[in-house]
């Protein structure tokens, strides 16, 4: 209730609510019971409790986005190791801080879309946002040695699998009257296919919303230059590249960017407050990325929101 009252007193117009976030399971959907009993066992809330929250958000006039982590799911891999990316011995491979269902496997597609449909029908979300819609990063050493099995039954490239999953999900979810979004790494604004299967034009061309995640503290330093100490310049450079990818896309999605709203996780751990976050927003607008933004701060601290009140009250 406090978050809703805060949002009503500013120009915030939407909430992003987790359906699932890796091993943090929002509520006890029967879809988990069917496809991933372990996830069902660890649900944090009941369906009724979640319905009440989303109803309050919607009744207050806000746009409700249901965020769903896709190919980062240790619980599913525990329940179905046969669909997990595996090592050379056939055992699920723990890489990039998780076990990963293979994006090549259609049963995984079926599960995630079934979960999205259930969320739309029971929670009345306006949009489903697929996060971790990619293969794991940092698999180079395994691929070089041949010590990894992606379960690639159809002989697809990674980028083909990601685009085809999103085409499948979008076609189905549009039948339920909702929009579909996809989160992509900041690197995806480059003019190449990434090693984890995200290619901006291929994704932007098939979903309704594409959300880059160009957090300045995720960029590599260049000598003594730390990008996270220069949020305006970092986002300006990134947005220029992202705008080019949008221009190359025949039917581009709406751009709605995730921006850094937390203190940097790299030295000198500089604070991100009204000035820094405002600089990020300004940079996006100057490069023509005007589809809106979402502010990422995993703590969801009300104290932090109050600190940022001048920024959110002044939004245009």
What do these predicted regions represent?
Residues 1-10, 37-60, 157-167, 237:
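Aromatic- and glycine-enriched glycan-recognition loops and surfaces
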Residues 2-25, 120-130, 206-211, 283-293:
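Catalytic domains of carbohydrate-active enzymes, especially glycoside hydrolases
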Residues 10-45, 137-144, 305, 312:
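Aromatic-lined carbohydrate-binding/catalytic grooves of carbohydrate-active enzymes
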Residues 28-40, 73-95, 133-152:
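Aromatic- and acidic-residue-enriched segments that line the glycan-binding/catalytic groove
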Residues 32-47, 95-110, 151-161, 224-232, ...:
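The substrate-binding groove and active-site-proximal loops of carbohydrate-active enzymes
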Residues 43, 52-55, 65-118, 278:
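Active-site-adjacent "subsite" loops/lids of carbohydrate-active enzymes
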Residues 58, 63-73, 129-136, 156-196, ...:
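Aromatic-lined carbohydrate-recognition surfaces of secreted/lumenal glycan-active proteins
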Residues 207-221, 230-316:
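Substrate-binding cleft of secreted/luminal carbohydrate-active enzymes
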